[in-house]
Amino acid sequence: AGAGGMGGNQTWAGKMHGAVVILVDADERVIQRRIEKNYMDMMVRSLDEAIAIAKEHLEKDEPISIGVVGNAADVYEEALAKNFLPDVVTEMCPCHDPISYIPSGYTGVEADKFRGEDRKAYLEAARETMQRQLRAMIEFKKRGVEAFEYGTSIRKECIDAGMPEKEAKQIEGFVAAYIRPLFCEGRGPFRWTCISGDPADLARLDDLALEICKGDHLVERWINLARKHLPIEALPARICYMGFGERRRFGLAVNELIKKGEVKGPVAFSRDNLDSGSIVNPTFESENMPDGGDYISDWPYLNGLLNCAAGCDLIAIQANYSMGEAVHTGVTMIADGTEEADVRLDSALTVDSGIGVVRHAQSGYQSAKDVCNGNGKIAGGESIKIPLWWEPADKVTFAPEGEYIR
């Protein structure tokens, strides 16, 4: 559910992987925009019609994306009543901002009017609907469906609205469920943007990514899918889950191509706020850390300080998600073909993902410890050369004599 600016990507991503996707949104205008931009194939007004079309395409093994005009809570409950159980159920509705969440019984236009007339009543209705939606997702999970939160803060918002925490957290967030093993390798949504605006630069960098990360099936699969299916919007750019070691090697190789004139350049390297060592969010990215460090906000600040010391071109301390409940660090590093850029990239592209590996190693993840010790699968033999302790916080020794100071 949720076909907005971020949620609309669910249909495109699903089709890229050969899936049949049914996406629900209460605002017909939003679905129509997704269709106009080729993010969605068609729009229907009933779940029954969507199911019929979905089954037809499943039989033919043909991917398709179907937008259903309706409220997520209503449609999820209807699907359960009809025992329609998809393989995966999630949502990208604006739960983190309940005033933008459309309550049951309202169209997008009606919600706009209601919101302006009685903000308090609107929020009450939105939160009531949100709890119905989450309970439906929990029921899907109980019936064997892969159901999870996609980072919308739905569980936290429902808890704040009175839903018991134990009940709300019967589904996981996707970071704890699926992404954290990647974080342990320093992977995350690493981004490069071709400032020249020339699509040929992006094509050359796609080729370079495949060269640098040869044998990394995650990178290889993604680059080949992305260059085939994703259009260029504004400046040519790519996001890719490269990890510790890979990012540094790639960045230095890009700078070399700019020196040689094979890439017009410059190229800006950045990443999402959701990255291995850049965020603390106890209700999502950093939930259920083995050492109990869900709330430790030192990590993103340390990330920012390290990037500053490494010569990063831009650093931003930010907070979003659940209106002040999280802290994260944004960065940008520039490759312009100069020797100075080599120095900056060598350092910044090491520490930015490296501190994420350290964070997860300190929390107790063995795969992250392996990366730190030079045994990472994609790190190319690189290790993280700082003092490390693999003990719980109350047993860590910081004094030179090895004595723990309280």
Predicted regions and their residues:
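Conserved mixed alpha/beta core segments that line enzyme active sites in large multi-domain catalysts
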Residues: A1, V219-E325, T332-T338, D342, ...
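Catalytic or ion-translocation cores adjacent to nucleophile or general acid/base/metal-coordination motifs
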Residues: A3-E59, P63, T90-R135, Q170-L182, ...
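Short, solvent-exposed amphipathic alpha-helical segments in soluble enzyme
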Residues: K15-H17, L80-L85, Y106, M163-K166, ...
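Structural alpha-beta junctions
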Residues: G18-A19, L85-V88, E139-E146, G261-K264, ...
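Extended hydrophobic packing segments that form well-structured cores
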Residues: G356-R406
